[in-house]
């Protein structure tokens, strides 16, 4: 079966937005007008086709990115293939957004015409900047009370530091929003309300908008001709570029991320969606318009590029794993080069394992079709892969490549979790492992000391949703504990302990004497053991017993029972008995010596210190710094990033719980932060006493 669409007719794009900017409604309308879904689903009644997880229907926020294939005839009547990736808009799911941005070629950024650039818009915009994604802007909800297109244009500049090139002007606003003025063709499009927005009339620009339209068209042309010296010279000599030339130049500027074409409409009222689809064809890149993906040769580690061509060796990136109730586990992959055929065996170069390709599916929001082949530029869902997780590369085993890995932040919050009924323990383990395979920012481990299952993630909402999904998808109900900090203990001074263990009551007894020096390990956090026995006061075969005895109590320190770090122990002398001594006797003696020694060597409590980075608009810098100081934080410095300020600090993890809520309210939700573990540091004595009371 040959390729149906040329690769230049593909558009792989996503829709990125703040929570309530109308992303799902816009996607729905796109699916409706491109003829894939017949009844328009409304988020208000929770039936949108893209929002297919139950929870999303309840919360009205989109959590998992689903990939949908649909088709659109451009203004030249030629059919194009759209692969639309739905992205979440909630701050705890920015990992999902990063993941989708990684495999997109372009994006539509939605704004709410009433709110303009909102906090999450800033976050997602910065992530798209990181991956250099070409974008268009759609100012949605023009029918809403308080809608103001011109203010939104201004906010794109002031808050995002980005250049918007206005392509359309609204005709009316709020309940009077009738249509748009196309600044390229200088015509007005007025939608017919009675046709659900499927039909519109092209008319002359109303007299009262004529002057404004002329002014904005001039700005549009000035931005366009900047893209080409020849066009610029002709323009300066008084020659106007043609309509085709304007579109070609705007396309060039968009793909090179020099500026962002801006449109307006109301997806809910079905106005402005079709011109937006034409703009996707006109201005967003196809897979061959963007730089080839870079990777390294899996054998030689030499850098290589893979071009978006069917003739190149097959390479693809797994960017999403989801559980489908009918098919089981589905791995969504973006094919960057080559052709994928059902039944072939591929190399997972990150894991060093082989995978056989069984079922291949083309996904619509919640229906699916089986396919036999897929090509460069396609996004496919593969059923039944065993080893592959998010961010892995799958490729031709004869030409192995590792495409650039995605980076996922370390989880920052952990809680203990247990099933409500003992019998569900195994089921819970399976559920958590399955969820961890889907989501690299979520981790599961067992606490060695308490035997409890600990789950860790990106934030409190993130873990709430995990617990919720466990209940819905795996029918396991769980109780969760309070968020916990992983403290440690160490020693600060040198102490010499001489300890004799003696138990002689008829028959064979037990005898061992040890003299051990305990001191801080100068080389770091590990445990170091040395024996300086000369002249056989402790026979060689008993020395390992001394080391084992000390190691067995390192997991529980003297202050509050936390694991100990950075201890050095040196066995300097001892004594034994021909009959009563044994390895076990020396183990017991060493254990007791360490318990005594840890107390005398100035035991100290340590806490994890996190490296915190807060990105905030300038007006909140003072509040952010004051708040971090109040959390025992040490400010390391600040720098400008675009129109925002980055504040770096070291803060104890214990003082960072609920930080996200505080930061949101402090900055009206416009600042965001990341944090990761940096090092351990002694706990101030007042705080240490409280911890000791709590855990001792």
Swiss-Prot record:
SUPFAM superfamilies: EF-G C-terminal domain-like, P-loop containing nucleoside triphosphate hydrolases, Ribosomal protein S5 domain 2-like, Translation proteins. It is found in: Cytoplasm. Residues 8-288 form the tr-type G domain. GO terms for cellular component: cytoplasm. One of its GO terms (molecular function) is GTPase activity. It comes from the Bacteria. Keywords: Cytoplasm, Elongation factor, GTP-binding, Nucleotide-binding, Protein biosynthesis. The keyword Protein biosynthesis applies. GTP binds at residues 17-24, 86-90, 140-143. GO terms for biological process: ribosome disassembly. The keyword Secreted does not apply. Catalyzes the GTP-dependent ribosomal translocation step during translation elongation. During this step, the ribosome changes from the pre-translocational (PRE) to the post-translocational (POST) state as the newly formed A-site-bound peptidyl-tRNA and P-site-bound deacylated tRNA move to the P and E sites, respectively. Catalyzes the coordinated movement of the two tRNA molecules, the mRNA and conformational changes in the ribosome. Belongs to the TRAFAC class translation factor GTPase superfamily. Classic translation factor GTPase family. EF-G/EF-2 subfamily. This is Elongation factor G. It comes from Chelativorans sp. (strain BNC1).
